[in-house]
Amino acid sequence: SDQKESPILDHLRDAGIEVFVGHDAAHVPADAVVVVSTAVRESNPELAEARRRGQSVIHRSQALALAASGMRFVAVAGAHGKTTTSAMLSMALRDAGEDPSIAVGAVIPQLGSGAYLGSGDVFVAEADESDGSFLNYTPWIEIVTNVEPDHLDRYGSREAFEQVFVDFVGCLRQGGTLVCCGEDGGSARLARYARTQGIDTVTYARAGHESADLGGSADVIIEEAHTDGHTASA
C-alpha cells in the first residue's frame, strides 16, 4: 500500500499485484509476511496490526537479501551515484549476455522499471547507506562510488558516516571483492583500510585525478572520459 496514486502503483497493477491507496489494518492478510521501509512508522495501522497479530515483519533490505540469497550479489553503494552506477552496470551485463536480476531506486528506461527478475545467477542492487540497512547484505562484490559525508542528521559526524562503510565492507562474503572510486577521499581511505584486512580491492580513477588518500595510482585508469549529460564514454 501507499499513501497516494503514482505511476509505480500502475506498474504494479499491470504486473498483477494487488495494491491499495491509503493505509488500513484491513489491507493486511493474516498469513502475510509484512515488508516495511524505514519510512514506515510503528504507528502505521497496517504495521501495528501485523505486530498485534504476531506476524513476521521484515525490513525491505532483509527482503532483498532473501531474494539475492544463493546468487552472485553485487551491491552498489555511495553517497552519490549509486542509482546511475547500478543501472549502468545492469545494462552492461545484459549487453554482455548475462540476464541479471535488478533492484535499483529509479526507473531504468530500457526496462521501464527499477526492478527485474532475470534468469541468470547475478543480482545487481542499489545499497542504501542512509539508514544503515545495507548492513543486512552479504555481497560477492561491493562497489563504492564515494563516501562524501551525508545523512549527518542520522550519523552525526563524518567519522561516523565513514565507519558505517567500514562496517559495510565487513559484510562482504569470504573471498569477495571491493571496488572503490580512487578520486574520492572517503572511498580511497576505505580501499586502503580494506587492503589492510586482506580484502581483494580494486580502485578506479580518471588519469591524474586520484585522491592523495589513495596513496598512489588507481588500479584502473580511465582515459578520455566524455559525457553529454545523457551518455558517457571512455
Tell where the protein language model's regions lie, with residue ranges.
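Short polybasic amphipathic segments
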Residues: 232-234
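Phosphate-binding loop of NTP-binding sites
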Residues: 13-14, 27-29, 38-200
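N-terminal beta-loop-helix "entrance" segment that forms/cooperates
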Residues: 3-20, 109-113
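Beta-strand->loop->alpha-helix junctions that form or flank phosphate-binding loops
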Residues: 2-4, 20-23, 58-65, 102-106, ...
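Compositionally biased, intrinsically disordered low-complexity segments
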Residues: 31, 172, 223-225
